[in-house]
Design a protein with these regions (language model features):
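Conserved residues at the C-terminal ends of beta-strands
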Residues: 54, 141, 191
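Short, flexible loop/turn segments with low-complexity composition
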Residues: 191, 222-226
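Gly/Pro-rich active-site loop or hairpin
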Residues: 30, 93-94, 118-185, 199-204
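Active-site acidic/histidine proton-transfer and metal-coordination neighborhood
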Residues: 8-110, 119, 201-208, 212, ...
Length: 226
């Protein structure tokens, strides 16, 4: 490693930790328990306050809320950010909110992502003040007009998302919804998972994503980039 690269690592700020999954299982594997503890350790190491979590398995709201409560108790001082994903056991804002609310935990919150939002066919006018208070962070990107088939929707999520503002789903509108709801996200993440963009090379992919993200934020929420 060069001195320049080492200095870059020292100066780099880690803002989020992920990804805890399978937290609803009655008998969690050693690997999942270890991964969970590693996430807690990474929060301590890097000074991060919340952990992104997903759930692929589909259970009732009541059961999921109980398991979320148990996870939040294990997390202690750290916030558990539940991320609704359309192909998961928490497919949309409605179920995500119901689970978080029913858990009764102060450190149970929501993470909202542009791609997951639009692929769940949700309009930009359904955030209530009560739900808004439980949003810890957001992730922005964009999507094509037509989604992949439901059976392979996760493939689109993992390989073919678009940079903010470069697709058909109005990333700026998503950001404005967050702003207008009075949400103060701890993190505004840029989650562009794209084989095509990454195939251009890391430098070009980073520059392209940064430039388009900046355009969206300057349009929708200029205070974030001032």
């Amino acid at each position: 490693m060069t001195k320049t690269f080492l200095q870059f690592l020292i100066d780099m700020k880690v803002t989020e930790v992920e990804y805890i999954v399978q937290w609803c299982e009655e008998h969690r594997s050693y690997e999942q328990k270890y991964k969970e503890q590693m996430c807690f350790h990474m929060c301590e190491l890097f000074g991060v306050g919340h952990i992104n979590c997903g759930l692929m398995e589909n259970y009732s709201v009541e059961y999921t809320a109980q398991k979320l409560k148990e996870l939040c108790q294990r997390a202690g001082k750290y916030i558990i950010g539940v991320e609704p994903m359309p192909y998961s056991g928490i497919p949309n804002l409605q179920k995500g909110w119901e689970v978080v609310k029913a858990s009764g935990c102060e450190n149970a919150m929501l993470i909202l992502d542009t791609w997951h939002w639009v692929r769940a066919n949700q309009p930009y006018d359904i955030l209530t003040p009560e739900i808004a208070e439980k949003v810890i962070s957001i992730q922005i990107n964009d999507a094509y007009e037509r989604p992949y088939a439901d059976s392979i929707l996760r493939d689109e999520s993992m390989h073919d998302r678009l940079a903010p503002g470069t697709g058909a789903k109005d990333t700026a509108g998503f950001v404005k919804m967050i702003k207008d709801a009075g949400i103060d996200p701890k993190v505004v993440g840029v989650e562009v998972i794209s084989d095509e963009i990454l195939g251009r090379g890391i430098n070009e992919a980073a520059a392209y994503t940064y430039e388009n993200t900046e355009k969206v934020l300057k349009e929708a929420w200029p205070e974030l980039v001032d």
